[in-house]
Amino acid sequence: MTVVLRLPRELRPELRRPWGTLYPRPSIKTYRRLHEESEVLITVGDMTTRSFLRCSIRPDVAVVDRKMLRTVPVDPGNKFPVTLDVNNPPGTITREAWDTVRRGIDYALDGDATLIDVTGEEDLLAIPAILIAPENSIVCYGLPGEGMVAARVTQHLKDSVLRLLTRFRGYDEWKSRSWISGITPCCTAKR
């Protein structure tokens, strides 16, 4: 049986708060600075990924579902040497999606930019990206109607995100099985 973390309805407002700096209208200089300052640059979401690509900046890891606001197809092209496909239903983080984010970050640390193509919904995959990425990485994601958030990965941010994750449905089962599957809530990709 696959362990799935499910977002409870009561946590949705908390996820609307930015975990980093909110950029209502990022400039090309902002995109370049974020790229230069990051250990690993991870984008979650089609609009965010497309915005970096339009500035000729390829994220180290891009997580997309090829839709913007659930409707418009987005094609990141063939700009990524590695593409990983995964299913992740809306409002969830599956074990497979978590492991795929980890693999994508591992590829990026080895020098291979990776596109993670999600069937379903990618929105919540910023959570494993933050928990897995090495410190000083930057995870960028969109906040609908607000702009783009750039979250610099620190131990403090990882601790905050983990506290939120413990409130997801299925967390206790996931935590109890994580040693079997080789994943842990605060796992760090190889450096």
Swiss-Prot record:
Its EC number is 2.7.1.237. It is an enzyme of class 2 (transferase). InterPro entries: GTP-dep_dephospho-CoA_kin. GO terms for molecular function: GTP binding; kinase activity. Pathway: Cofactor biosynthesis; coenzyme A biosynthesis. Belongs to the GTP-dependent DPCK family. Catalyzes the GTP-dependent phosphorylation of the 3'-hydroxyl group of dephosphocoenzyme A to form coenzyme A (CoA). This is GTP-dependent dephospho-CoA kinase. It comes from Methanopyrus kandleri (strain AV19 / DSM 6324 / JCM 9639 / NBRC 100938). The lineage of its organism: Archaea, Methanobacteriati, Methanobacteriota, Methanomada group, Methanopyri.
